[in-house]
Amino acid sequence: METRSLYVHIPFCESICSYCDFCKVYYDQKQSDLYLQRLNEELSQIKQHHLKTIYIGGGTPSALNDEQLEKLMSMLKPYSLEVEEYCMEVNPESMDYYKLKILKKGGINRLSIGVQTFQDHLLKEIDRHH
């Protein structure tokens, strides 16, 4: 059997970093709700559920609110049953205890924490907040 992976792009950010070249837009609840609806429609077309990895990147996937994160985890559940690595990018500023619980319950077993620097003056220079 072929090794397969799934990348899910969540393009929403609470702020736009000057150095980032990835496809992103400012977080908007209505837009992100619609995006998740369309993502669910696309996922329903995937026949292959034997995935080795799932990677949720962005943008800032952790910019989604609790309800949206729960919906995302629910949508991906059928694809995550045999996954070895289930990763999501997060920004320290947009994470909290409840979001971590949602991700753990959803099966996430690896976080990619977007810490660019711990030095405040450098954060300011690159328009980064956390």
For each predicted feature, which ranges?
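N-terminal [4Fe-4S]-dependent radical SAM core
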Residues: 1-7, 22, 48-50
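Conserved non-cysteine loop/helix-boundary elements of the Radical SAM core domain that shape
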Residues: 24-130
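Residue-level signal for beta-strand positions within conserved beta-sheet cores that form or flank
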Residues: 2, 18-20, 82-84
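Alpha/beta-hydrolase
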Residues: 8-10, 115
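Local cysteine-cluster metal-coordination motifs and their immediate loop/turn environment
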Residues: 11-24
